[in-house]
Amino acid sequence: KPSVRLSMKILAIEFSSDHRSVAVLDGGRLLAEQTVTEGRDTAAVALIESALGQAKVGRLEIECIAVGIGPGSYTGIRAAIALTQGWQLALGVKVQGVDSLEALARGEQAGGRRGEVTLAVDAQRGEFYLAKFELSDDGIRNVEPTHLAKRKEYELLLTAGRPVIGPGLGDTFPAAEHVGCLAAGRSDFVEASQLEPVYLRQLDFVKVPPQREIPPV
């Protein structure tokens, strides 16, 4: 596998919630981050251009795109994947898909939270995506993989007083900064065409391939 250089310029995209964000990193060091809360109405390309401008990094300097693949807003994640596919097609950048709940756990750990915590995302239809992580000084560890749970299981966690966080539960959302930080330490690059949103229930509609947005060189 290709090795990850500490100085690799990373563009990170996290659109799995209504708090959409884009970050530019140099290895694991954050150079710039732009966040909007308008959700799907956000002009994604403008958000990327704003982050690149703030970081003073040109499109051609980006070597890797790290994209949050959910679980979360299927529409938002598909939009982020389409952007990533366009960039790889046009500029040949490396690509990584990052679990959005893992990025959320990384953000909580970086912010000082410790111990076991359940991360929850509303999956609609009375169901929730749940995953459990252990946060420590050494990092994060997934102790219960993401699964689709009924509302009752989610409510039992709340009534039992277990720490539960996630989009819609206070001001906690996956952030592009932490998507990029996770990608900075890895070398599991993929073809952007292989990326798919984390979606644990059977699709009940026909997926139409998204139109790729190819950045001008």
Protein language model features and the residues they cover:
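Surface loop/turn motifs at the tips and blade-to-blade linkers of beta-strand repeat domains
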Residues: 35-37
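Short glycine/serine- and small hydrophobic-enriched flexible loop segments
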Residues: 49-50, 85, 89, 181-185
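DPxDG-like acidic metal-binding loop motif
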Residues: 64-95
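Oxyanion-binding and handling regions
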Residues: 4-29, 40-42, 96-217
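Phosphate/pyrophosphate-binding loops at sites that engage ATP/ADP/AMP, CoA/4′-phosphopantetheine
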Residues: 48-64, 157-162
